[in-house]
């Protein structure tokens, strides 16, 4: 019964295909629903993962989150109470929790004509709450921790995606 009844781990994942489509590689997994991802200027991948609304209020609820998707990473999402605790040695922590919402578009500010702090930020769009967050990354060990900032918000503003134009402007829908 319920969401994903009988579904097996690893649930959401990111896969890489060769240009000819003959080879594929499972890059990282353990997401609930990795809606979008982007690459920073160093080629590191960051994934915006969705929450499971049915779990809200339960001890195993996981909010929407930004994950630093290093090769072979596992983020531990499983249905219901089966989620891996964040202290498992082979489960990577998220960069930042966003909270309840509907993740959609994500992009880095690289190429904008914004102040430097915002050029380095990753931008996350939330459809439900009409909010775009700027997440400022700080190195922590081999990964990052993020500090979120409300960048654009309005009701109604059902955001869907964000892009950076050749003119240095940010565009969003």
Question: Where do the PLM segments sit?
Answer:
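Beta-propeller domains with acidic blade repeats across secreted/periplasmic ectodomains
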Residues: 1-173
């Amino acid at each position: 019964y319920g969401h994903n009844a009988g579904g097996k781990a690893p649930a959401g994942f990111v896969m890489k295909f060769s240009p000819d489509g003959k080879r594929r590689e499972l890059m990282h997994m353990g997401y609930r629903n990795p809606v979008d991802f982007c690459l920073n200027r160093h080629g590191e991948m960051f994934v915006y993962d969705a929450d499971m609304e049915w779990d809200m209020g339960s001890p195993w609820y996981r909010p929407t989150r930004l994950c630093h998707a290093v090769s072979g990473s596992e983020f531990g999402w499983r249905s219901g109470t089966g989620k891996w605790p964040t202290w498992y040695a082979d489960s990577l922590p998220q960069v930042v929790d966003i909270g309840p919402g509907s993740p959609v578009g994500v992009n880095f500010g690289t190429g904008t004509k914004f102040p430097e702090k915002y050029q380095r930020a990753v931008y996350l769009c939330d459809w439900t709450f009409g909010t775009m967050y700027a997440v400022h990354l700080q190195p922590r060990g081999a990964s990052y921790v993020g500090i979120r900032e409300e960048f654009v918000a309005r009701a109604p503003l059902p955001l869907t995606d964000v892009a950076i134009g050749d003119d240095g402007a940010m565009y969003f829908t």
